[in-house]
Amino acid sequence: MECKYFGKCGSCSLYEGGYEEQLQKKVHEFEKLFGLEPEIFPSKQSRYRARAEFRYIDGEYAMHRLHEKGLVTIDACEMVLESIYELMSKLRLLINKHEILSNRLYRVDFLSGLSGESLVTMVYHRPIDEAWEKAANEIAKALHIDIVGRSRGKKIVIGKEYITEKLPVFEKEFLFRHYEGSFTQPNPYVNIKMIEWAGRIAKDLQGDLLELYCGAGNFTLPLSRYFEKVLATEVNKSSIKAAKENVALNGIENVEFVRLSSQEVTQALRGVRDFRRLENIDLHSYNFQTVFVDPPRCGLDDDTRELVREFDNIVYISCNPQTLHRDLEELSKTHTVQKVAVFDQFPYTPHLESGVYLTR
């Protein structure tokens, strides 16, 4: 990827040596830490990111500078999906034609996907009202997008507050509602590779699946075809709401989503505590043999790590090699690593996603 803002814009913290060399160095650091040789899944080198946030300064998009305080104004971003790339300049021109839209506009967020749908969030340091809504509605129609306006204590939605993403996984298309402000995988091309890697493992497994940290069902729905039943849990209310909508959109009937933290799942499975949220679910009816976890950067807490060790098969997706290494030191006391992979979700940064499959 060639970008005139390399070395200035802080969104890409690695910019020397080219993409292949950067990825090679990240993989080498992973291999040194784990002593394992992973399967490598690279990213597209440009136009790969499905969400982006930009400050808005004097009618221009801006990002934080790389090695110093302050902002650098930009007219384009090579990282973002083609749909966002094409939208950025058109949106800026229309915003700047309407003072009511540009006045004290603090930030502009973009959310898009392989489906081509786009949602823009405009965040203000002033109240927004009906006059703002009228102007925003005009540009939403002109650009065929949805818009969410936000100011302190107020939200105005023009159209929908989500996009419907279409992910082709093993030649089957899955639909996902990605809501404004909620977590979604940032790189859909690498996300598909992650799901398919997990799917190649799951197709040879037996029994039922327990998934912790399921989010809006990104892995749940494609993996559900390989199991008799799936119980998927997540603590975030909006993610569970989206997950239930997504399972209905796809006509999948062997998945139950429940709002529980990983600690609460541990308590429920061990009979330590009863939960009203589980009153319509018979935990004893499940034949759990596989657990799938995709925890936050902090990794697994002690109780969840002990619970995970009780399963025959563990599929672990990690966004932090350091906490994955800590967790594997414990999991490896009862399980053996069968497969390991790295996924370059975040090109031009030090970050590296990884996946590990362990069996007892």
UniProtKB/Swiss-Prot annotation:
Catalytic activity: uridine(54) in tRNA + S-adenosyl-L-methionine = 5-methyluridine(54) in tRNA + S-adenosyl-L-homocysteine + H(+); uridine(341) in tmRNA + S-adenosyl-L-methionine = 5-methyluridine(341) in tmRNA + S-adenosyl-L-homocysteine + H(+)
Protein name, entry field: tRNA/tmRNA (uracil-C(5))-methyltransferase
Gene it is expressed from: trmA
InterPro entries listed in its UniProt record: MeTrfase_TrmA_AS, MeTrfase_TrmA_CS, SAM-dependent_MTases_sf, TrmA_MeTrfase, U5_MeTrfase_fam
Lineage summary: Bacteria, Pseudomonadati, Campylobacterota, Epsilonproteobacteria, Nautiliales
Record keywords, A-Z: Methyltransferase, S-adenosyl-L-methionine, Transferase, tRNA processing
Residues that hold S-adenosyl-L-methionine according to the record: 185, 213, 218, 234, 294
GO annotations of cellular component type: cytosol
Family: Belongs to the class I-like SAM-binding methyltransferase superfamily. RNA M5U methyltransferase family. TrmA subfamily.
Catalytic residue positions: 319 (nucleophile), 353 (proton acceptor)
Top class in the EC scheme: transferase
Organism: Nitratiruptor sp. (strain SB155-2)
E.C. numbers: 2.1.1.-, 2.1.1.35
Task performed by this protein: Dual-specificity methyltransferase that catalyzes the formation of 5-methyluridine at position 54 (m5U54) in all tRNAs, and that of position 341 (m5U341) in tmRNA (transfer-mRNA).
